[in-house]
């Protein structure tokens, strides 16, 4: 292996001496960071510094690689002005220390693909294109700046030097980084802890929630990048001798640094030049120099993320290979853009700016729309959703509607001059209908019943059985009577005792009988009725007997036939209706009186023959002879006396007419019918006539 020729070291720039220490940068608070983000970054960087303290044991005299020296363009010594002297040799001792610090902080290894870089002039002069980097920028100096939704986290960019020490001790620093895996894990745990704190502090705000998501994604990318840096450093430590002798790789590194430096739109930190021994200035948080808007770095952040992912994948696949092969694959994976793409970069930046502005405008308008939607509209301007259905007319609305119609019609007629006679309506008296069910104590409607309950139900005269048991729930509204003391107790009336005793609500007083209530009394009342009827008949018979007693006997034969007919009709009607007995007539048992009637008929005929021996029986009927007038008068005189004496016995004769047939056989002038067929009827009629005319006298 060929030993590289030493290269004179470059002079230290003035910016290195003027650069503030890391502790001063961390102590100052950035204006563009909120409190939570600033505290998180401060803890993160302080923890990394404590884990990896700086090393002062380094070789004072270090030599650079001739291939790296040849890769540096003329006049472009890392931002140094032309004519500056190279840095002294005693400064090269800090190179190993700076390399370890940068790897611990997440920067790239000396031969790793650099991050985005930009010139400080891009922040100073806003008119120039931030994506264009001047050619005077050092090819190995790369500064990575990542922005996370308003919280800018600055990743310290590790300066790469094209000069390498030919000594084996110089490359031992890269091999010594293999033990930094544990430090990387601790840093990852610290980042996870900081992420959890950020989640707790920023979960309350919706805008900060978006920032939190982007921050977590970028922090995970940062951790992956740091692990890739460690692996790249390890691989470089293994094959460091081969890289020092490869001039072509050095030239590719030069081209890569120049191309990527021209395409980056993010401003880098204050660039420090190489020390005499090749040491680098420690990275610092830029705040005063970086003043870029979030819109200017939108496209660059996307490109950085893509490049870092591709670089990490390639390193994971080829980590067993040589460092030169790894570097070549990275060079092929990362697109290179030179100065000729300035116009294209400007166009991309302008497109990114326009997209960001459009996104912001959309966000603002969306917030305004939300505010406008959340504010309630007044009632008169409220939106009507869907078709409104017509409400059903109630009684009140119908009455109100008809009233308004009548008012409008009346006003219209008044305007037209139409007059209408006002007639008082005829009010018919409303007929009160009594509830039929309430009268019988069965109405279940209560107050809802449409019929009247203003009456006393018929069941009020009956005792309430439920009240007697103590289970009536209707109270005063009960249709039955609750005054049970009016009604006698059945047990006490029938058995003479009551089981309930004094607790019985019915009356235990026996009512006094005003009249006979036994069946014998009823029979006596029934017998008294016909007795009264018989007394009335007797009085009427006495009246009729007094009337007929003053008439002469000669007037009787004139109306004999008519009287017989009337009596025959009366007897027939009496037989048909035996219940109703006319006054003055008493019917006799004719069946028993048949033999008596024949005897009586014979007596009558014999007396007539004796009285009229000379003439026929009908010659002198109704004409008394003058010679015999005295005889008739005497005969009537003799008969009148016994009739008056026997008035007391007339009742007995009426009751038992058949007992004394001789008294009833009085001489009469009744004519006997000639026909034999009517003999029986005539005999009965004559007997009835005698009873009717002369029975009271006997």
UniProtKB/Swiss-Prot annotation:
Superkingdom field: Eukaryota
UniProt-listed PROSITE patterns: ZF_C3H1
A single GO cellular-component term on record: nucleus
Zinc finger feature spans (C3H1-type): 429-456, 458-485, 486-511
Biased composition (Low complexity): 12-21, 65-74
InterPro entries in the record: Su(sable)-like (IPR045124), Znf_CCCH (IPR000571), Znf_CCCH_sf (IPR036855)
Ranges of biased composition (kind: Acidic residues): 281-300
UniProt KW keywords: DNA-binding, Metal-binding, Repeat, Zinc, Zinc-finger
Keyword DNA-binding carried by entry: yes
Sequence ranges of Polar residues compositional bias: 535-548, 665-680
GO MF annotations, alphabetized: DNA binding; RNA binding; zinc ion binding
Protein's name according to its UniProt entry: Zinc finger CCCH domain-containing protein 7
Native organism: Oryza sativa subsp. japonica (Rice)
Lineage: Eukaryota, Viridiplantae, Streptophyta, Embryophyta, Tracheophyta
